[in-house]
């Protein structure tokens, strides 16, 4: 802003002393719980509690076998419970580690807030520093839309209104002034005081810092900025519903396993059949009638029911099976309950929240590197479903590097400034009717602070050897009207040395608006000539400004109701300012249009300027007509019904106001579009809040940033396209995790269920199922949640925001592949039960005989084949709908690391003697030949997919 006085501000030495005495301008976050306590909180997870119950049940069985039955294995019976507890420890440790990692990613918002630049005066020069570097004694300049960085006392205030609702709850902005006669006695805070965290809604001012950091009013009630993850998006609601469905199905399988194992144990006794009825009724009630119950509540009730059921079995034991020992019955019952509970644990997708969290954390970090700062978590997902982007022109489509292209000041000969009155009026008007300033810290590269358009004018003065600071110091500001997008001009009334006993009114803004306020023109230039000049500039996509002045006496009313009412203004001329299109924008717009996303320009510029920019970026074509463009006034005149019929055809709204942008968003939403909108000003906040995704600009106001969901740090449209790509990729990563997990679910649940009714030992033991669960949930979440985005997603149409996350292709994959794995393993289970297999190659020339049960070697084969088939299927899931080979690993170091852990872990589990005991693996493990056959056979799932991919690629 322009200063009424010259301020020196603090020197570098004084800054260091102040920081040492009063501290840094950083709010100390609340002390976090120690890491050990956070780790122990993981054991409060209901899933972990249920696993602990299973572990203690396993200990009970082992104790019974060791002391009651005196089994031959001796202490080896305790390896299974130890394995369960090791699995629990591993699961909690991994979850704890990645939760810490995600927290660090989400903390980035606070760090960025502290790095925001603030305009200050130091060493007699206006410059910018990070918010955290503000110190007591600093002179800070604040403008409309700024967030006040520290507590202080106002030195100057022009039409200053501040939103203090974050501190006092008042919805009406507080008026601020340095004039004692305007002080409000009943105000929550002093009229000449400004406070950290409050926002300038109108006007501008200068204040001196009196308190920083924890000593500010805001610091006393500090609550760290958080990424908002409380919003229930369509995706999160779908995932919640999917989890409920999977949980219900897991109870069906658990109930059937209990029934099946009991019937087999009692040789299908008729009395046992009577126990199936209450079991079926119980699970039906739990699944259908108690939707309000959490899944772990249902699991605990299942355990309680099972205890009651087993009590009934024990009571009728002598009638059912007098030749079976009570000890054997109890051991079988406990083992059955453990298998049922573990299956529920395996089936419930507890890894889904981790997959979503990791996907969000990873996406947010990588989006930050592509200049997208995510402020609200749901925006990551919603950007992927965006169908329309409503974008500003200046700074987003253009470089925002304003330079004076040409001047047309009618009183200047050869457009050269001199010492004449006309030149002096122009120089003074440009200098004082401005809120911008220039940072001369680096004299060879002056930096514009504030509005780039106004900065271009100040640089033009500099190029003409005119000091805007000296001009500002020679005048006294009497009154002013700040620029607004509604008025489209700004004005200032000053006491000037150019006119003794007179005042001068300077007006600057949109040429047609300013010219409309004027009574005459310098040198009597005809209106037609001015219009012709403007058309020429606008057709070159130039931004234009008009200038006017009036000399008045102190009694003339010049402002009324926020408008200029002076009636004798003289139009001085126009300035054309160039702002080239960003070089990467045409390709980015083309990419969005190929991705099925409509782009609409909403700008305050004229229709000619907007159309030329649209043409340069490839949006406006020779086929477009007047139905594709509309001016702000015409737009406002449309009824809602008329607008809804026309809105999809619109490509450009010129001379738009902020409320036009909000109304455009609402109309598009009524037409079932998912809308992202850009904004940088305070008045853009309503549109940013109304859109599905609000995109604020990095150099936008704090008000706009707070209203937005994502901040585009470099202001570029190409960064918006990257945000869409990341949003689509995040959604696909979650789909891939679900594809893999549900395929494993289908195979595991049906395999264990088949084993229960076939009367064999459970094909997968408790510890083996927990290892599968670790692969399926934790490791798969880690592997698939952090996959880099594929540019192929930008060739697809936007997804239906409300469509079910499991699409038709996924459904067929889950049923087909999961069913195939189940049938394959069921066939092997049947063969192993009816043949004595000592080497896997025996399958090629075997003869089936009577049922002889499963040997430890055969169970080891089943377990290893199950894991390795799904291991290779993980590659397929990773490549799902990418159009790439499953062996394409560019940028997937994390995936390769996790795949290596799974592969090495499985080999170690089968071959290391100490782990063999924990996971019920046959002593001695498998032979090299067995491993070769298993790896070659199970990898066919990968090679078949690759062959199909090659066939499709060749056809395309």
What residues fall within each predicted segment?
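Alpha-helical transmembrane segments and their membrane-interface junctions
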Residues: 819-836, 906-918
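Active-site pocket-lining segment
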Residues: 867, 875
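Conserved cytosolic headpiece of P-type ATPases
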Residues: 1-798, 803-806, 863, 880-956
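Membrane-water interface at loop-to-transmembrane-helix junctions
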Residues: 800-820, 849-861
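Active/binding-pocket-proximal capping segment
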Residues: 168, 837, 841-843, 878-882
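Helix-coil boundary and interhelical linker segments in multi-pass alpha-helical membrane proteins
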Residues: 756-765, 831-857
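Core segments of transmembrane alpha-helices
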Residues: 744-748, 813-825
